[in-house]
């Protein structure tokens, strides 16, 4: 939960070949409700889907979006709530993913850490425009402003992709409680020096606390 927040607005689920992370936002417990709704709806949708492919991951997030938008329409006090979502599934030799918001998917391969998802955030737009550097994203005053989130509008575009993977690849999903405080280079360094994924988690969470732990943090690490 971190050192500052009183509520944990992060949620996740892990099954045999699918995992997801959500990070909610909004007042009156809205963030907690949105992230819980999203992860539950995504999990239920995918568990009832006979074939998992890139389209079904996108559809799962869109399904969650509709459910949250409808909930907000019924309860005005929840207006403004929403959540990030990143969903990953391993199918054969491919990693399928879908994403909205600034929760991230990384892959670590051959001692290189690559961010697969693109943040839907104000600071990402500034980075793309060449106005700030990757390092400046972490300390920018607008780093928490999202340009896209699940549950905010009926029309939602979900990023998605398919990535070939091989034995030994490591994947990392996280909320901005990690990526908003710890640099990509530090994450790469930890993965380089530590083979045990549980120890990786413990080390990164310790780093977050050393950096102030101003947000909830959720991290999933796995090896193909």
PLM-predicted stretches and their roles:
Residues 1-224:
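PP2C/PPM-type serine/threonine phosphatase catalytic domain
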């Amino acid at each position: 939960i971190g050192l500052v927040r009183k509520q944990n607005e992060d949620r996740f689920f892990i099954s045999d070949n699918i995992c997801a992370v959500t990070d909610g936002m909004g007042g009156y417990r809205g963030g907690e409700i949105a992230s819980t709704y999203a992860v539950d709806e995504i999990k239920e949708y995918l568990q009832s889907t006979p074939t998992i492919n890139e389209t079904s991951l996108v559809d799962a997030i869109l399904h969650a979006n509709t459910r949250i938008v409808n909930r907000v329409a019924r309860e005005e006090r929840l207006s403004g709530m929403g959540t990030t979502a990143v969903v990953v599934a391993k199918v054969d030799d491919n990693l399928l993913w879908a994403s909205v918001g600034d929760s991230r998917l990384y892959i670590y391969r051959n001692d290189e850490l690559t961010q697969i998802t693109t943040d839907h955030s104000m600071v990402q737009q500034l980075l793309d425009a060449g106005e700030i550097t990757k390092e400046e994203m972490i300390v920018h005053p607008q780093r928490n402003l999202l340009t896209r989130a699940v549950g905010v509008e009926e029309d939602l575009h979900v990023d998605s992709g398919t990535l070939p993977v091989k034995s030994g690849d490591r994947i990392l999903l996280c909320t901005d409680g990690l990526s908003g405080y710890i640099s990509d280079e530090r994450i790469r360094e930890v993965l380089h020096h530590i083979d045990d994924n549980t120890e990786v988690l413990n080390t990164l969470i310790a780093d977050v606390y050393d950096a102030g732990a101003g947000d909830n943090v959720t991290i999933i690490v796995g090896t193909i």
